[in-house]
UniProtKB/Swiss-Prot annotation:
Domain of life: Archaea
InterPro entries for the chain: Trp_synth_b_CS, Trp_synth_beta, Trp_synth_beta/beta-like, TrpB-like_PALP, TrpB-like_PALP_sf
UniProt pathway annotation: Amino-acid biosynthesis; L-tryptophan biosynthesis; L-tryptophan from chorismate: step 5/5
GO molecular function: tryptophan synthase activity
Subunit structure: Tetramer of two alpha and two beta chains.
PROSITE patterns registered for this protein in UniProt: TRP_SYNTHASE_BETA (PS00168)
Function per UniProt: The beta subunit is responsible for the synthesis of L-tryptophan from indole and L-serine.
Known EC number: 4.2.1.20
A Pfam family it matches: PALP
Cofactor(s) demanded: pyridoxal 5'-phosphate
Organism encoding this protein: Pyrococcus abyssi (strain GE5 / Orsay)
Protein name: Tryptophan synthase beta chain 1
């Protein structure tokens, strides 16, 4: 329930019953043979696991220094790591006897992943989305509807993600007998950060086996981008006990920390309570959640998962920032040297890995979690970069 002093269940009494029910069911099902057999089946045959660990030889040569490997979550069905958690939680809900999934989404990626999992398992899906985001993300809204989901625009407050979260929670309190609230990252009240981490840690388990096979040794460094933090937690967790492996999370530096236009909760935030958990958040003097900025829609979250807060405080992981500009450069670099167009989120991790590789020796090994593909970001890049 707690990661050091972080985490917890900072929720109204009305949410305690559904959370207790979820915790009990997860404890029962996580080692259940039939549940795991079905999860493994869908991950393999529907989602396309295991994803490859790819040695980026041309990028490595160009950069000079450490070998750079990419864990190819961009090749997962749906185009990003989000699918691991969506199918895991949807199956969990089905085993609990639920018939409906509720989720909130900002950029739309988590909504799409939830809609995919709901369609696969024959469940009703309702997605809450800030009215402003509905306007900005027309293609993802269409995708969700195509997959059979009902998209509910939220017109309250700032009409963005945090308002969508409030509406989704309100719905869950009223309907939890037959609904499951599917959180998309390692955030929220206990047991969500643990559940999401466990479903995502398939990334790290595979990467560990794959790097031992390729190099005969563990990597020196693992680099992953951090918004809420689920792709990073997924690749970090199976390596946490290996003290020789440096774990580096890359936050969105936006237009630079000094500018105030960023999403770097661990580097520039303060400890507070939001979304049912104690963690680091970007807050103003009054403790109100600040508006965030990142060129990568998926890093635009004003907080971070409690386990990351704990890994930072305990010194087990390091957290750095990469600006919009640096991420864009890495986006183009990887596209041109390896023929892989990364998501802008993942490009933050690539950018830091390039910087780091230059300072390391040729015998050293870096694994980058390439958490998603960049098709969804082409409009953004076109606007910012103009003709490539």
């Amino acid at each position: 329930m707690w990661f050091g002093k972080f985490g917890g269940q900072y929720v109204p009494e009305t949410l305690m019953e559904p959370l207790r029910e979820l915790e009990k069911a997860y404890k029962r099902l996580k080692n259940d043979e039939e549940f795991n057999r079905q999860l493994d089946y869908y991950l393999r045959t529907w989602a396309g696991r295991p994803t490859p660990l790819y040695y980026a030889e041309r990028l490595t040569k160009k950069v000079g220094g450490a070998k750079i490997y990419l864990k190819r979550e961009d090749l997962l069905h749906g185009g990003a790591h989000k699918t691991n958690n969506a199918i895991g939680q949807a199956l969990l809900a089905k085993f609990m006897g639920k018939t409906r999934l509720i989720a909130e989404t900002g950029a739309g990626q988590h909504g799409v992943a939830t809609a995919m999992a709901g369609a696969l398992l024959g469940m009703k899906v309702d997605i809450y989305m800030g009215a402003e985001d509905v306007e900005r993300q027309k293609m993802n809204v269409f995708r969700m509807k195509l997959l059979g989901a009902n998209v509910i625009p939220v017109h309250t407050g700032s009409k963005t993600l945090k308002d969508a979260i409030n509406e989704a929670l309100r719905d869950w309190v009223a309907t939890f007998e037959y609904s499951h609230y599917l959180i998309g990252s390692v955030v929220g009240p206990h047991p969500y950060p643990i559940i999401v981490r466990d479903f995502q840690s398939v990334i790290g388990r595979e990467a560990r086996e794959q790097i031992l096979e390729a190099e005969g040794d563990l990597p020196d460094v693992i680099v992953a981008c951090v918004g809420g933090g689920s792709n990073a937690m997924g690749i970090f967790y199976p390596f946490v006990k290996d003290k020789s492996v440096r774990l580096i999370g890359v936050e969105a530096g936006g237009k630079g920390i000094e500018s105030g236009k960023h999403s770097a909760s661990l580097n520039a935030g303060e400890i507070g309570v939001f979304h049912g958990m104690l963690s680091y958040f970007l807050q103003d003097e009054e403790g109100q959640i600040r508006t965030t900025h990142s060129i990568a829609p998926g890093l635009d979250y004003p907080g971070v998962g409690p386990e990351h807060a704990y890994l930072k405080e305990s010194g087990r992981a390091e957290y750095v920032t990469v600006t919009d500009e640096e991420a864009l450069r890495a986006f183009h670099e990887l596209s041109r040297t390896e023929g892989i167009i990364p998501a802008l989120e993942s490009a933050h991790a690539v950018a830091y890995a390039i910087k780091l590789a230059r300072e390391m020796s040729r015998d050293d090994v870096i694994i980058v979690n390439l958490s998603g593909r960049g098709d969804k970001d082409l409009d953004i890049v076109l606007k910012v970069s103009g003709n490539v």
